[in-house]
Amino acid sequence: MKIWIDADACPRVIKEMVFRASERLQVPVCLVANKDLSKAHSRLITSILVADGFDIADDYIAEHAAPEDLVITADIPLAARIVANGGVALDPRGELYTEENVGERLSIRDLMQELRSAGLVQGGPAQFGLTDRKRFASALDRTLTRMVKRKR
């Protein structure tokens, strides 16, 4: 079992929560990004620097994550790929992607992208806040507890 983080756009506070959970449960973490990341001081945490380009980090994660791994990503197409391969994906705002909800999330994402392109909608998601952090911490704890129990 490993935790993968789509690290380019992942908030620092989320990475720090994952690092603490990693130490507590002794689960390795791999950060994947197309820019250099500050190194966390733990033998359990590694970083992969991929080439700069559209979906390169996502492709790396999708190709290397195993079904027993957890992927932290806000990228809905990546989450859909992980779920389709039997894996577990969690959004930095605490939403667990499932077979039941990932298709709907993709459809909403695509619609919003079209509406933004047409100038009918402006802006993106709300600013990341305290409620999001709490929701993520709770979802991370529940998900990792379930995954660790299943592993044993």
Curated annotation (Swiss-Prot):
NCBIfam families: PRK00124.1 (NF001095). InterPro entries: UPF0178 (IPR003791). Belongs to the UPF0178 family. HAMAP family: UPF0178. This is UPF0178 protein Gura_4014. Pfam families: DUF188.
